[in-house]
């Protein structure tokens, strides 16, 4: 099955403002499957780096279930100008412009999902995003919610990895609101030095001093599941444990136990093995 590549990146000779969504690879026929997995990269990712990250993630899912994606649905890469073409340092210095670019890209993507005739409400959309791409994703969901006559695919599951999103934006009445029609999952890490240090500096430009969602997984009650990964900021896309966690979100992971069995324990994948073994013995004793 062809991987679809959507882009809002401008041509090199133009200023890096997001353009209308365009098919860089694949067609609407490839995209309009019953289930669509949309991948959204983060901050300071040139297109080739994003493609490499997406491939690692897709390969990880295939390693969990070899029938993915052929028997599951479509895989769609989304590319947006989250970087400055002059390099990583320029991207960091112009962080405020990257945030604005994420917002503008979200508007473009939400319009595409709403207006594209081949994308209809009988299709299910799953989104996995990383870093500043998580903010872009939440912006997309907010834009969709504004459209009372939204005609696009239904968002079923959202997984936010190392989310570069202020916690306050997920608490404020004017921020990103949850929706009972979808599940929202957070994968976070207290060891993420990018979110611990760099994110705070970047947000200070906007007068915001709140910590990032992807650092501690807060606000706790907002998310349907929270998974501590113990990973560094750039380690998510190619991590096997993250792939297994995502596979369960997509419904291609290990089969769940029948209801009459005790519930499975969802261990923190960053926990030391000795704590996992101790918890496992406790569960066995209770049986």
Put a short name on every predicted segment.
Residues 1-32, 43-58, 62-124, 142-157, ...:
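Lipolytic serine-hydrolase domain surface
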Residues 38-41, 130:
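The conserved beta1-alpha1 loop
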Residues 109, 128-133, 137:
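Gly/Ala-rich beta-loop-alpha elbow adjacent to hydrolase catalytic centers
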């Amino acid at each position: 099955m062809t991987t679809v590549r959507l882009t809002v990146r401008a041509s090199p000779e133009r200023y890096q403002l997001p353009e209308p969504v365009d098919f860089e690879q694949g067609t609407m026929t490839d995209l309009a499957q019953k289930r669509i997995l949309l991948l959204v990269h983060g901050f300071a990712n040139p297109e080739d780096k994003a493609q490499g990250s997406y491939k690692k993630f897709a390969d990880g899912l295939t390693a969990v279930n070899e029938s993915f994606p052929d028997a599951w649905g479509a895989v769609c890469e989304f590319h947006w100008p989250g970087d400055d073409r002059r390099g990583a340092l320029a991207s960091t210095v112009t962080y405020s412009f990257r945030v604005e670019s994420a917002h503008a890209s979200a508007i473009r993507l939400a319009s595409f999902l709403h207006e594209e005739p081949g994308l209809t409400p009988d299709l299910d959309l799953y989104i996995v995003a990383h870093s500043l791409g998580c903010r872009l994703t939440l912006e997309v969901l907010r834009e969709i919610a504004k459209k009372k006559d939204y005609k696009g695919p239904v968002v079923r599951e959202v997984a936010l990895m190392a989310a570069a999103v202020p916690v306050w934006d997920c608490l404020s009445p004017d921020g990103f609101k949850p929706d009972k029609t979808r599940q929202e999952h957070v994968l976070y890490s207290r060891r993420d030095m990018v979110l611990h240090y760099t994110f705070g500096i970047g947000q200070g430009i906007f007068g915001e001093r709140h910590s990032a969602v992807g650092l501690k997984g807060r606000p706790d009650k907002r998310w349907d599941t929270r998974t501590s990964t113990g990973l560094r900021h750039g380690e998510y896309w190619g991590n096997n444990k993250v792939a297994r966690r995502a596979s369960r979100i997509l419904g291609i992971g290990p089969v769940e136990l029948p209801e009459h069995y005790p519930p499975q324990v969802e261990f923190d994948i960053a926990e030391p093995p000795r704590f996992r073994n101790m918890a496992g013995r406790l569960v066995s004793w209770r049986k």
